[in-house]
Amino acid sequence: MNYSIRLFKIMGIPIELHITFILFLVVIIGLSIMNNSIFWAVLFILLFVSVVLHELGHSYVAKKYGVKIEKILLLPIGGVAMMDKIPKEGELRIGIAGPLVSFIIGIVLLIVSQFFDININGYPLLYTLSLLNLMLGGFNLIPAFPMDGGRILRAILSKKYGYLKSTKIAANIGKSLALIMLLFGLLSMNIILILVSLFVYFGAEQESRVVEVETIFKNIKAKDIMTPNPVYVTPDMSIEEFLDFMLKHKYFGYPVVENGKLVGCIGIGNIHKKEGTVRDYMEKPVVVSEDTDIKEILRKMANTDRVFVVEGGKLKGIISKTDILRAMSILELKEELKD
């Protein structure tokens, strides 16, 4: 289900409003009407126009590096330019572009407001908007993920410490900052600050994990991490025989092979009765080839505990979540020792 509404396109990039943004806007407008003041509603709308321009700054430079921009999504807590993986060589310039746009808007509005301003309900609109843009640019330059400053910091540090270690440094700063924000948010009962702190924390955590997986599993294929020549069961094996087989080999899931070909898979969670055979309970296996990369393997494992490696119609190996974690631990240690 799509939870966003497309407004228009700029530079070929769709601008979309998330449904929560619309609900938040309705609340802001409602409160403005109740208080006989439209200032905050107008300011809110103009601020998010500024956010769109901020994200377009990132997107414009990113497109120069051949990055595909899916869309810019507006949320109550800000905007997100959803794009393909940013190339390492362009991360510094792409990261700086957004805050630079915000600073330019802020400085221009600040200068203009000294000669001309729009007063609504006694509040100076342009002056207030200029300060918010300067704050937006400054906040995004905080050297912590998922803010732009985190990407800028990583781009600078990666020249000395490597991409993975630099990501972890920026992510840890981001999570530490998020915990401080959460503490202040809870003490002051500030819902917005609490939501922003959660966004920052999980954004930093996600960035760290994604980069860690991409870095340590670079050039790793299914054949490199699979358990080769796995034990298997046959479709005609009784459930009682299967349970004894499972007790002997200590695994929770097994491939089902008939006449040398993989025909299914079965695990402890598939068994509900003692009657019948393996054929009655087996499921369709999720299959990959020996050269399948880790990204595709993880995508296929989203709804299953294991995938089976098949080449030329023959079962070559099995990859379980335990295999993934084991390989990750070993490869992560190799990466750390390399640095």
UniProtKB/Swiss-Prot annotation:
Keyword Metal-binding in annotation: yes
Record text on cofactor binding: Binds 1 zinc ion per subunit.
Control of this protein's activity: Inhibited by 1,10-phenanthroline.
EC number(s) recorded for this UniProt protein: 3.4.24.-
Subcellular localization(s) per the UniProt record: Cell membrane
Chief location: membrane
Lipid bilayer topology: Multi-pass membrane protein
Cofactor(s) this protein requires: Zn(2+)
EC top class named in words: hydrolase
Molecular functions (GO terms): metal ion binding; metallopeptidase activity
Active site: E55
One of the protein's GO biological processes: proteolysis
Name of protein: Zinc metalloprotease MJ0392
Species the sequence originates in: Methanocaldococcus jannaschii (strain ATCC 43067 / DSM 2661 / JAL-1 / JCM 10045 / NBRC 100440)
